[in-house]
Design a protein with these regions (language model features):
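Non-ligating segments of multi-cofactor redox enzymes
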Residues: 1-191
Length: 191
């Protein structure tokens, strides 16, 4: 049995992150750790250390799928790990992220008002009106929180769906952060 490290328990962080956002949307900013740290580690380390050791979401999928037997453990369809699908999904994800940043900019510039809504799959509004008390922070900070939490929650649900249908960490095959870090590592290792 391999020795346990502190980072073997980061699946708890994933649960805490989503629970905190459920009660106060401003905790969505903590998700920037999962957004920036993999990129920084890939840029400066030239490896996928984050994906392999620090990704709480991947660990959560392993815990649920393998340990709690919530996965059918069927092989991941080849198209999900194909280069064209991974890059198309990354492009889609970055487009959604860019749209979220643009909406935040519009709120900051006063061109539009704050949209206090969490959306699943960029379409369906989740009725969590209690997650934010208006006026607590500037509107653009809250707008970013709603958008980013929506993005994170949607990706969690996509990961859970493919975890149940296929192998526990099927999400990792086309995770946008994994695709970006892999690209960075390939560039770094060519140097």
């Amino acid at each position: 049995m391999k020795a346990k490290h502190w980072y073997d328990y980061l699946w708890v962080y994933a649960i805490i992150y989503f629970a905190l956002g459920f009660f106060n949307i401003l905790f969505a900013w903590l998700g920037m750790i999962d957004f920036l740290l993999p990129l920084l580690l890939a840029i400066f380390g030239g490896n996928k250390f984050f994906c392999n050791h620090l990704c709480g979401r991947g660990q959560l999928f392993s815990k649920l799928g393998t340990d709690l037997k919530c996965s059918r453990c069927k092989p991941t369809p080849r198209w999900m790990s194909s280069k064209w699908f991974r890059y198309a999904f990354l492009l889609f994800f970055l487009t959604m992220f860019g749209n979220m940043v643009f909406q935040t900019y519009l709120v900051a510039a006063g061109a539009t008002s704050l949209r206090e809504a969490i959306k699943l799959f960029w379409t369906f509004r989740v009725p969590w009106g209690w997650t934010y008390a208006a006026g607590t922070v500037t509107d653009w900070v809250a707008q970013f929180s709603f958008g980013f939490y929506s993005l994170m929650l949607t990706s969690l649900l996509l990961g859970l769906i493919v975890m149940v249908l296929y192998k526990p960490r099927t999400w990792c095959a086309f995770c946008p952060m994994g695709t970006m870090t892999q690209g960075i590592c390939k560039l770094k290792n060519k140097e």
